[in-house]
Amino acid sequence: MAAVNAHRRLRGPYTFGGALLRVLVTEALERSPGLADRYDIEIDAVLPGMRERAPGRRRPIDATLPEDERILVPAPRRTLRLANGIAELALAVMPEGVSLVADNVHEADPTDLELLQVLSRRLPGVTVVMVEASSAPADVIASDGTTGDPEAWAAYEALDPAVRKELHDRRAAELGWEEMLGALPWHLERGSDPAAAVEALWAAVDRCVGEGFLHAVVDLGQRGLALSEAGSPDWWRFAQRTATALGGLGRRSEALVVYDQARRTSLDPAVHASSAYGTAMLDARHPDPAQRDLGRATAWINEAIAISTILPDPRERAFKLGFDQNGKALIELRQGRLDAALDLVESAIALADELPDGAHPLHRMVLHANRAQLLATLGHPKEALHDLDRAIAYDPAVPDHYLDRGNLRLRLGHTDAALADYETAIAVSPPLPEAYYNRGELRLGQGDLEGAKADFDHVIDLDPGFLNAYVNRAGILEMLDDHEAARADVVAGLALDPRNPHLHAVLGQLETAQGDHAAAMAAFDVALEGAPGLASIWANRGILRYESGDPTGAVADLTRSLELDENAAVYFNRAVAHRALGREETAREDLRRACDLDPDDPDIRHALGS
């Protein structure tokens, strides 16, 4: 495969990824048409012009809805799923020994940089080369502004402005859908028709929002703002999407600037309501609880609700008021007021029922999913399941709702149904680490160590930063006596979270097995500092204390473990410690209780007999 110019100015997000995917899809179609269909979501997102060749089977409903009903913005991690899907197609069709060369990577969109990292990690037989040098033509117009040749740029700047505009217009007329996120708006911005540029920028923003290309939304949105009259409807469309993307990327102060600018330039009540809502969510959704000012968030969301309540159009009022009430429900939830949160969501559902039949299905879907979470937390799992069923019915292509329903079914003991939900989530989504992780936990709970380990292996392949996968895999490896691999996972996990109590608990077991009692004790101490309510850590430290010649300390730790969770093995171990202290009758009491809990254990029966 020839070197690919990865400059985002060519085709925007996935400039490199689109070129690669075109080759992969062509190869997949030659081998087996069904193979390409398995990656329909990735093809739709990265190379939509090929969807007719690989029509696929998974189609979310948002593509069929009008603009004002497409309310969902994918999380930033969606692009990691897409990158892994492309990598898995490459694994299926790309021969070993191939080199992939991307140049102009210093100007690549973050989606391509992420993809290149995933390909480097997941394709061991393929060489991925990234360079900053440019293979673009040494002409500004012909290269779509990607050339790095200073002489070409000097010649371009020396052109008569009218000639420059005409050249940009001509080049824009030659471009099509492949360049709609990159070269097309770039040329139109510099051509003679500003209205066409605004239209092209909006089309690009709208598509990038739907796909979750948030960095591109910010770039394109800011360019659209610069070409639009402040306070105009076009300006607000760009402003709202730009601020939303900035918030999703964690750039909250920049998002706040956009919302403040909207408040200063608009007299439209709906704009003020939406700006107040967006400002409230910057606090309510902050990933660090310590950084959330929920009082300030409440003030802003109350303003949004107050304005939405008096909007004159009944349909707009029913939607926006319900939308704002759902936002306030999140703030109430963050403050532990679950009943108040539930009341707000139910009020929003009642408002949605006032909308015309079929209107705003995504809004209704979100409301039922949110009510399900609240009902489950409040101890109403059957009602929660009903709401999740309704959410899934609105759009069966949303994987997160299958995960939520699977978790709830597992909690209710419906293991087979939970497994089916996890596997459906896997089927309807690009590679989804959370779905494999949840299935791995289910398999671990069933005692299927090899199956669970395979799932956790895949989670770490998909996302090397998935901490809990290291925790669980390390525990499995320790149980399988693969101490070297378990220690490697502990080290990798502690690099992500140096004080993680679960990893220190596994480390304590590994050090105990190696005979380093001092290191084991230190590890268990750290684990208990972080998770004092975890019975297994107290039990393992109790065993260590007994083996270190401290039966009194062992009894204390084992007693604390039993206070947290009755367990036959822990009663047995405490009986052994009591016997070492000469407390025969107390030991026998523990053995009898152990036998009650596990009457078939031969070690317990033998100890009672002796």
Predicted segments — roles?
Residues 240-247, 277-287, 319-334, 362-377, ...:
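Conserved alpha-helical positions within TPR/SEL1-like repeat arrays
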Residues 153-159, 204-215, 244-254, 283-298, ...:
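Short coil/turn connectors between adjacent alpha-helices in alpha-solenoid helical repeat scaffolds
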Residues 81, 135-219, 224-227:
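Short secondary-structure boundary elements
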Residues 1-97:
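Conserved phosphate-binding/catalytic loops and adjacent sensor/switch elements of nucleotide-binding enzymes
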Residues 188-191, 226-235, 264-272, 305-319, ...:
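Flexible helix-coil transition and linker loops at the boundaries of alpha-helical arrays
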Residues 97-102, 107-143:
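Sensor-1/coupling segment of RecA-like P-loop NTPase cores
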